[in-house]
Amino acid sequence: MSRRGTAEEKTAKSDPIYRNRLVNMLVNRILKHGKKSLAYQIIYRALKKIQQKTETNPLCVLRQAIRGVTPDIAVKARRVGGSTHQVPIEIGSTQGKALAIRWLLGASRKRPGRNMAFKLSSELVDAAKGSGDAIRKKEETHRMAEANRAFAHFR
């Protein structure tokens, strides 16, 4: 048993312009090769495009998209007696948000289009409306958890 104490959970810092933690979480996930200024540019351009498309507050659209994509339950592979079962587990709010952001960015990277800001803005607007690849991924995860409900006692 470890003598070290449990690590304190760090609170996410907020970004300089919108003063929002979700935007900063998004920036840190979109980051590639340490180019944080480029990540900020992409996010801010995407939010500006959302403002132009929907004529509403882009932060509201972002919150709505993340709320729509956040899963309540997921499956985890658990090995029991030589066979691997997909065991459904509940997900906390922080982990759910992180998954939602990862799915949104993955779906926007797969989209055809000009640049990442355009693709991200389109995916966020679609997710806020309840469509898009990220929403499909959430529904697929929920279906998997529902199908494997019989193994829930293996937790």
Swiss-Prot record:
Q: Name one GO molecular function term.
A: rRNA binding
Gene3D superfamilies given in the database record? Ribosomal protein S7 domain
Enumerate the InterPro entries for this protein. Ribosomal_uS7 (IPR000235), Ribosomal_uS7_bac/org-type (IPR005717), Ribosomal_uS7_CS (IPR020606), Ribosomal_uS7_dom (IPR023798), Ribosomal_uS7_dom_sf (IPR036823)
Stored Pfam families:
Ribosomal_S7
Compartment annotation: Plastid, Chloroplast
Cross-referenced CDD domains: uS7_Chloroplast
Mind naming one GO cellular-component term on file for this protein? chloroplast
- UniProt record, GO biological process: translation
Keywords recorded for this protein, A-Z = Chloroplast, Plastid, Ribonucleoprotein, Ribosomal protein, RNA-binding, rRNA-binding
Domain of life, source organism:
Eukaryota
Enumerate the NCBIfam families for this protein: rpsG_bact
Q: What subunit structure does UniProt give?
A: Part of the 30S ribosomal subunit.
Protein role: One of the primary rRNA binding proteins, it binds directly to 16S rRNA where it nucleates assembly of the head domain of the 30S subunit.
Q: Which family does it belong to?
A: Belongs to the universal ribosomal protein uS7 family.
Protein name according to UniProt: Small ribosomal subunit protein uS7cz/uS7cy
Species in which this protein is naturally found: Nandina domestica
Q: Give the gene that encodes this protein.
A: rps7-A
